[in-house]
Amino acid sequence: MAMRAKDALGRFGEEVASRHLAAGGAAILDRNWRCREGELDLVLRDGADLVFCEVKTRSGTRFGSAAEAVVGRKAARIRRLAARWLAEHPHAPSSVRFDVVLVSRPPVGPVRVEHLRGAF
């Protein structure tokens, strides 16, 4: 997949995830927050929880499921990035959760969204 197509797919997934989470009552605080170590896809408030949400978008299953992409080093990196975000936002809620939203956009059929609360 060309880099531009991959970027467009990622942006599509983040938009779908944002709308899905907002429809469930979450307030988006940050999108694509960046620092020198990397990027957090979504930071949101869900009730009393501060949620760091990784969005994974797939157009098929040949690379494995999206949930399989957020394990080990990737999860550790997201935790480090969350610590950086919290350092810059000292008044954020103290209850923190890490979620993953899986967006599947198959070549045929409807888009599917799966929200894994407390994924890691």
UniProtKB/Swiss-Prot annotation:
Cite the GO molecular-function annotations of the record: nucleic acid binding
Report the domain of life of the source organism: Bacteria
Looking up CDD domains in the UniProt record yields:
PoNe_Nuclease
Segments spanning the bilayer are none
Under HAMAP family, the record lists: UPF0102 (MF_00048)
Similarity section: Belongs to the UPF0102 family.
Question: What protein does this entry describe?
Answer: UPF0102 protein FRAAL5785
Biological source species = Frankia alni (strain DSM 45986 / CECT 9034 / ACN14a)
